[in-house]
A protein has these predicted regions:
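Cofactor-cradling patches in redox/metallo enzymes
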Residues: 58-160
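Histidine-centered active-site/metal-ligand motif
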Residues: 54, 105, 165
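Compositionally biased, low-complexity repeat tracts
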Residues: 8-11, 146, 169
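Conserved small/polar residues in nucleotide/adenosyl-binding loops
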Residues: 164-170
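Non-catalytic terminal/interface segments that mediate subunit docking, oligomerization
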Residues: 1-83
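Non-catalytic alpha-helical coupling and interface elements of nucleotide-dependent molecular machines
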Residues: 1-5, 117, 163
Length: 173
């Protein structure tokens, strides 16, 4: 059978360091407001697509988002776009967060966006981060990616921008 790596989230690490900083508190307050208004926390599915096995960034993002108050799901490693979309729908997530390091973003992310469009899924956003050359950003935005992050972005930026996009009146579609 096919190898399946298990991934888990270690929460509390990021929050214990930043819990008194205004940026951290601003985001956690926004998440609490979302919970009050929607009856549940914002939910993100963090994934790696294809054969990209560099999962450290995805683990860091997952742990930080949990500390911000998001419900966090982590997709198994080495998933195809259809498998990620299926899990995102089943888990009723608001955000699909794609971590990429191995240049699969040029084909795999547009394939994932096509799967979402084919299924008329318009109630979730897609964000991605990793080593994505600036020259590829327009292609990904055209495919429907809401935001793209790189090593220059802080985790606070990633959470804040992702939250802002998920609360826009029209997410995708």
């Amino acid at each position: 059978g096919r190898f399946k790596a298990s991934t888990s989230t270690n929460s509390g690490v990021f929050g214990s360091i930043y819990k008194k900083e205004s940026r951290f508190l601003d985001i956690t307050n926004q998440v609490e407001s979302f919970l009050s208004e929607n009856g549940r926390r914002p939910r993100i599915l963090v994934c790696k697509l294809g054969q990209d096995g560099h999962d450290r960034g995805a683990k860091v993002i997952s742990s930080a988002f949990a500390d911000f108050g998001f419900d966090v799901d982590i997709a198994p490693m080495f998933q195809a776009p259809k498998e990620v979309v299926k899990q995102a729908i089943e888990n009723d997530v608001h955000v699909i967060g794609i971590s990429t390091q191995a240049a699969g973003h040029k084909t795999l992310i547009p394939d994932l966006m096509k799967c979402l469009n084919d299924l008329n899924v318009t109630n979730m956003i897609v964000v991605c981060g990793g080593n994505i050359p600036q020259k590829d950003h327009a292609h990904l935005h055209k495919a429907g990616v809401a935001a793209i992050f790189g090593p220059q972005n802080s985790i606070h930026d990633v959470a804040s921008v992702s939250y802002t996009h998920l609360t826009l009146p029209t997410r995708r579609g």
